[in-house]
C-alpha cells in the first residue's frame, strides 16, 4: 500500500525539474547546462534546489572545480532518462495505424560502423517508406548501450565486451583489424617491412582498447607487435584515429575493409603482422522492454531479416 506522501509526490512535483536535472548530469555542470538550455545559471541552480527539496535528497555535490552525482542523484537520473525516452517515443507511437508507414527512428551508433549490408538495408527501407525520418547519435559503445537501456534510442550499433543481461544483441557484421601507418611515417615507403622493425614505435589507440573494453583484442595486437608502451594519441572516433595515423602521429589499428580506399589512394599502408589478426563483432542492440512504433517494428524486422538471409561469413569483412 502506498504511503500518503508517495501518493502526493507526482502531483507536487514540477516535472520540468526532471528535464533540467537530466541536462545538468549529462552536461556535467550547472554552467554548461545553463548554456545548453539557454537559461541563466541562477535559474538552473534554483531549479536543482527545488528538486532536492521536493525529493528530500541531495542530488548533486557542488564544490569548486568538482562535479559529482550522489547515489540518490544517480537513481533519479536513470529514471529521468527512461521517462525522457518514453516521452520522446510519443510522436512515433501516435503515428501508428496510418495507411502509409510514418514515424521516427533514433539510432545510437559507434563511429566505425562501415557495412555494405547495413547501407543497403538503410537505402531499401528509406526508399520503401519515404515518410519515416531518422536521427543518428554517434557515441562510444558504452554510451550506446546506456541509450538503448534508457529507452532513448530505437536501437544501437556498437561493440560489446559482453552482452548486457537486459538487452538483446545480434551480430550485424564482423571485421578484422590490422596495423597501419601514414605517408609521413619513415616505414611507409620501405619496400619490405618486418614485424621486428615496428617494435618500439609510437602508436595511437581507440579509447576502448583496454582489458575490459570491447577492443581488447586490438590491444593484444599492439602488444604482439611490441609497440611502445602507452599511446601518443587516443580517440573514440575512427575518423579522428585515421587522421592521426595519416598525419604520422603514430601507428594505429583500423578495420581492414575501412582502410582499403585509403590504401589505394596512398594514404595508408598496412604493417605486419598480417596473420591471426583480431576479429571483432559489431552488434545490433535492442531493448525488449521498449514499446516499438510501427516504423521501428518494420525497420528492426528488416534488420533481422537481413542478418538471417546473409551468412555470418558473408557479413565478415576483411
Where are the model-predicted features located?
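A late-sequence structural motif
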Residues: 117, 269-313, 317
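Flexible hinge/capping segments at coil-to-helix
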Residues: 168-204
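Hydrophobic hinge/microswitch elements
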Residues: 140-145, 149-153, 158-159, 209, ...
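Central regulatory/effector-binding core of bacterial HTH transcription factors
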Residues: 102-165, 318
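A short LG(V/I)-centered, amphipathic sequence patch enriched
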Residues: 52-71
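Short helix-boundary/capping micro-motifs
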Residues: 22-40
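Alpha-helical linker/hinge and terminal dimerization helices associated
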Residues: 54-55, 76-98, 303, 310-313
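Secondary-structure junction motif
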Residues: 201-226, 292-294, 300, 310-317
